[in-house]
């Protein structure tokens, strides 16, 4: 990680999602992309790992380590976990952050209390200034939409826990709506479908691959084939 610090400059962007957190800076693009999760000891409730390492621990020994996430449906539900996770990620690039301006993508409709909690957590990690940007605006900028022109651009940002929709014009949001439904809900529906229709238990990785391989929101919808392996729910064979 030290090799990328000089290239981050004074501007850092963070996208804190229900499933994944990404940190971007300078010309290097994404420099951190890890699960939005911490792992605690089930007996002493001490934090033992964050991000990738936390996900690995929980997957290997779920009885020993308890997963905690700071967000539910895109909104903060545990400020302590949020503070711990942000400090971990931001401290990875602490040299760059000591005088950095940090831009944080947030859902539409975030309350003043939630906004202040987010800003306080980032500032306590060492940022000089913190700015919040609604995700539809950030997505519009990222895809090159003419957001500063006097015409509307409709943006739909589908995250793990929420769908943020906004009409962007003249540099701001004209109207917006957040639905507390996202990619993780689609995954859960696919998981139930595979279990009920085929009597098979499959991994989260396979479910994610099914979604990206055969899923579509574009007409015409066509049947697609997907071969997968799993564990039989009746006899446990895989």
Residue ranges and their predicted role:
Residues 1-158, 166-238:
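Nucleotide/phosphate-binding catalytic cleft detector across ATP-hydrolyzing
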């Amino acid at each position: 990680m030290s090799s990328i610090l000089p290239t981050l400059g004074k501007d850092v962007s963070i996208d804190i999602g229900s499933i994944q957190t990404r940190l971007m800076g300078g010309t290097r693009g994404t420099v951190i992309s890890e699960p939005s999760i911490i792992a605690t000891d089930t007996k002493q409730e001490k934090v033992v790992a964050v991000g990738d390492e936390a996900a690995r621990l929980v997957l290997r020994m779920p009885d020993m380590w308890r997963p905690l996430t700071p967000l539910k449906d895109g909104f903060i539900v545990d400020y302590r976990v949020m503070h711990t996770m942000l400090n971990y990620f931001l401290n990875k690039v602490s040299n760059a952050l000591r005088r950095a301006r940090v831009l944080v993508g947030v859902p539409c409709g975030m309350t003043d209390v939630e906004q202040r909690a987010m800003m306080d957590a980032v500032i306590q990690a060492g940022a000089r200034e913190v700015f919040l940007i609604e995700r539809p605006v950030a997505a519009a900028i990222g895809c090159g939409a003419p957001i500063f022109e006097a015409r509307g651009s409709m943006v739909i940002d589908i995250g793990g826990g929420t769908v943020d929709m906004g009409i962007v014009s003249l540099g701001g949001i004209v109207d917006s709506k957040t639905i507390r439904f996202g990619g993780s809900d689609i995954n859960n529906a696919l998981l139930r479908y595979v279990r009920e229709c085929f009597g098979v238990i499959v991994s989260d990785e396979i479910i994610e691959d099914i979604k990206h391989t055969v899923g579509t929101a574009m007409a015409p919808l066509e049947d697609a084939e997907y071969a997968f392996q799993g564990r039989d729910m009746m006899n446990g064979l895989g």
